[in-house]
Amino acid sequence: MRIDKCNGGDKLKTKDGRMAVYLGIAYSKEQLFTIAIFPGNNNYYITECNCHGIVDGFPSDEIIGYWED
């Protein structure tokens, strides 16, 4: 099920203006999320499902699986 229109590698911004790169869609036990990585940080972060911008979410240990769009 496609839940957004982001493309892999899309440049996205956090609310505080930091850039991130869209990687795909992740899922936790509760919900589907988009997933992005922040430059200079090797951790993945789950983010809210929208393509207009992303907010900081849970660290990667909350992710139980992900796939590329």
Where are these regions (language model features)?
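Short acidic/polar mixed-charge low-complexity motifs
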Residues: 16-19, 42-43
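Mixed-charge, Lys/Arg-rich low-complexity intrinsically disordered regions
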Residues: 1-8
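SH3/SH3-like beta-barrel fold
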Residues: 35-38
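Short beta-strand-centered aromatic/proline hotspots
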Residues: 18-28
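Repeated polar recognition positions within modular binding domains
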Residues: 30-32
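Tryptophan-anchored aromatic micro-motifs
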Residues: 11-14
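Intrinsically disordered, low-complexity, charged/polar segments
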Residues: 40-69
